[in-house]
Regions:
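Noncatalytic modules at the cell exterior or secretory-pathway interfaces
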Residues: 125-140
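Beta-rich globular "head" domains
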Residues: 68-108, 136-149
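Serine/threonine-rich low-complexity intrinsically disordered regions
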Residues: 7, 27, 57, 67, ...
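Repetitive, compositionally biased segments used for assembly/scaffolding
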Residues: 1-70
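Short, solvent-exposed S/T- and G/P-enriched segments that are highly enriched in secreted/extracellular
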Residues: 75-84, 110-128
Length: 149
């Protein structure tokens, strides 16, 4: 599977075949290879079909959360702040919103806003972005996890 994950042509063929794509997102071994491949992550970030399949699969979501490519951005300080986390392509995987009374934050992927709860839990995002990833948050130790592509 690693050979397919690192070959853009082969990966595109898998993404364009619903049966093959469903087989991949259902397999922890296949998804581990995909989630470890920069080539695969870049292809997935540009495919709404692939993102939909991943979002519907607990196996695929867990593979992204365990990806060696995953980057964590942690909030420092207790104040409402908007930060641009990344310019360029990637996948916002999940966020930990540390508990705070007084409101929720948001994550923007290509200027599309998704609210997250500041309640001390991990919340899946699974949003691809092509140009930018930003976050509005308050509480120290809140952490946004994403895969740059």
């Amino acid at each position: 599977m690693a050979a397919v994950a690192n070959n853009k042509t082969a990966l595109t063929a898998v993404i364009n075949n619903a049966s093959a794509l469903n087989t991949v997102v259902s397999s922890s071994t296949a998804m581990a290879a995909v989630a470890s491949s920069q080539t695969a992550m870049a292809a997935i970030a540009t495919s709404s079909t692939a993102m939909s399949a991943i979002s519907a699969s607990t196996t695929a979501i867990n593979a992204l959360k365990a990806s060696p490519l995953l980057v964590a951005k942690t909030k420092s300080g207790n104040n409402w702040t908007t930060e641009t986390v990344r310019s360029g392509r990637g996948i916002a995987v999940y966020i930990y919103g540390a508990s705070v009374s007084g409101g929720n934050g948001w994550v923007k992927t290509d200027n599309v806003q998704t609210t997250f709860s500041s309640n001390g839990t991990n919340q899946n995002l699974l949003k691809a972005f092509q140009t930018s990833l930003s976050v509005y948050w308050y509480q120290n130790s809140s952490t946004l996890y994403y895969i740059p592509c």
